Amino acid sequence: MKKGFSLPLWVAGAARSALKKLVGLPFDNYELIKIPNEKKEIKIEIHSVGLLKDDSHALGISFAKSGLYLDITQNLEIWTIASLERNSFNNPLQTNPINIIAGSGVGIKEDTSEICISDFAKEVLYENLLDIIPEGFNLKLEIIFPNGVFLAERTSNKSFGIVDGLSIIGTSAETYSSASPDQLEEAKTNLAKLVQNDFKGKVVFVIGENGLNLAKNCNLKFPILKVGNWIGPLIVDAAIKKVKTVILFGYHGKLIKLAGGIFHTHNHLADGRIEILVYLAVQEKVPTEIIVQLSHLKNLEEALLLLERFDKSIAEKLFLNLSNTIEKRSFTYVNRYVKTDMEIASIIFDRKREIRWAGTYGNKYISDFQ
């Protein structure tokens, strides 16, 4: 499979090139980007760089190459505008030498208006820019994705309270397809490492960057494994490795697929989310006219809002049933391949990243996530 590099590296490459131009260093058609806490550098191609506004600003441009055909950021055009600001006389040792600003097409958090950028992305920027900033100055770095607003409409960003563009996420330098067998093998290798030495028998499986970031913020006492879309085979692998408890932690829009017996959750392979919700609504004896409305909705968040407007108690009961169904269907799935009494727990969060529901087993651990 063709390898690529995550969005933070391409942003850092464009930013480093712009800053070098601003301080008078020569242009190169690539930048060697250092990876935090790793002894390696990655060559990032730079498209162009130039000075703006009477040479007080510099623009660096790169095009992301994630190596993933279906990835939304493949060939994404990235602009970074660098400018320098003198340290304040009253505060010569400012604690934030780099001010990262969300320009057009870059996602911000709806509730705080802060730029949506991962800790890894910030670390990559700091690692590769601090050594070029002249003494006595701070760097103002505006990041722009010219096509970001349009592309964001094809993501679930709004479901997580991210608006106005694409978020700058990523927790590692290299990328791989979430539907690729390579990802499954890497996740199985990581699971094998987790269950060694002082492993206590319980592990948290998360899907996607939002789930991973939220789980890390919970300061869990359990190890966390990002499983991508190969969740079914990895639950089976956990049973083979004699794991005692797997806690499935994720957004309802992904985990609902398990309730319908879909154990590879990539949307390009199978969807069925609304259909599964309609089935659960029938079980809860939701009126026919509401079920018809549900069947025509585009996503699960719209369905949840419709159900809550109709009857909050029924909506809550339905999603609790969803949590229990996820646990039961997952246990049945695993036992097709390996006989096990491994406990499978489900804990689900909503678009506001609030932990809302848990199954029978998930309730035993939900306090650890709050």
Swiss-Prot record:
SUPFAM superfamilies: CbiD-like (SSF111342). One of its GO terms (biological process) is anaerobic cobalamin biosynthetic process. One of its GO terms (molecular function) is cobalt-precorrin-5B C1-methyltransferase activity. Pathway: Cofactor biosynthesis; adenosylcobalamin biosynthesis; cob(II)yrinate a,c-diamide from sirohydrochlorin (anaerobic route): step 6/10. Pfam families: CbiD (PF01888). The keyword S-adenosyl-L-methionine applies. It catalyses: Co-precorrin-5B + S-adenosyl-L-methionine = Co-precorrin-6A + S-adenosyl-L-homocysteine. Keywords: Cobalamin biosynthesis, Methyltransferase, S-adenosyl-L-methionine, Transferase. Its EC number is 2.1.1.195. InterPro entries: CbiD, CbiD_sf. HAMAP family: CbiD. Belongs to the CbiD family. This is Cobalt-precorrin-5B C(1)-methyltransferase. It comes from Prochlorococcus marinus (strain MIT 9312).
